Regions:
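Short amphipathic alpha-helix that is part of the acyltransferase structural core
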Residues: 1-34, 156-160, 176
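C-terminal "cap" of GNAT-fold acetyltransferases
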Residues: 135-196
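Conserved GNAT acetyl-CoA-binding A-motif
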Residues: 96-113
């Protein structure tokens, strides 16, 4: 395994990166691709194609702010999964950033499906459940982190979108698509199996 991270803008096959992104996340979870590209031109964003031996196998999108890395998107090409690539990427990110937070679609413990499989993957790779959930753009998310002692607050989560760009226009566009200013954190135990 020879994993490399190549800036999206100098990647040879941008179309493949875009296809991995679109095939890995449902419509409600996805930012418009043009918006990701626009924000990625700023210094606090890492938008990388993930390569193994010069073959594109995945994509990562990280927003950096206040000594935190928000792993907004991580996807391995569906034809390349279960080869240890995702674990290697998370290991590399954890070496680079002391505190990583991410949100995944909330998995219900009694339902074996892709959501639970994804959560188990992150837990196996050094992430912890914060037992905090939020609702954003019609999707219920659970917040995970690799730093068990990090305090997840509304302000921390609000910044994950605000720090994507310095452009007031782009911030406005983001606020119209995703829940930037109206974050309601819920403890998982309070929710039970209910969606809020």
């Amino acid at each position: 395994m020879d994993i490399k991270y190549v800036d999206y803008f100098i990647t040879d096959n941008k179309k493949h990166v875009k296809n991995i992104y679109y095939n890995s996340f449902n419509k409600l979870e996805r930012f418009p691709f043009w918006l990701l590209k626009k924000c990625a031109k700023e210094n606090n964003i890492e938008f990388n194609a993930i390569l193994n031996n010069s073959t594109i196998i995945g994509v990562e999108y990280v927003v950096k702010y206040d000594n935190v890395a928000y792993l907004m998107y991580l996807a391995i090409d569906k034809t390349k999964r279960n080869n240890g690539y995702g674990s290697k990427v998370l290991s590399d990110l954890s070496k680079k950033y002391k505190t990583i937070i991410l949100s995944i679609e909330r998995a219900y413990n009694n339902i074996k499906n892709e959501k639970l499989h994804r959560k188990e993957f992150y837990l196996r790779n050094g992430f912890y459940s914060t037992n905090i959930c939020l609702y954003d753009n019609g999707v219920e998310y659970e917040i995970l982190t690799n730093n068990e002692n990090y305090n997840i607050t509304k302000e921390v989560l609000k910044k994950r979108y605000i720090k994507m760009t310095n452009s007031k226009l782009i911030k406005f566009v983001i606020s119209k698509i995703f829940n930037v200013n109206n974050i309601h954190l819920k403890n998982k135990e309070q929710l039970g199996d209910r969606i809020f």
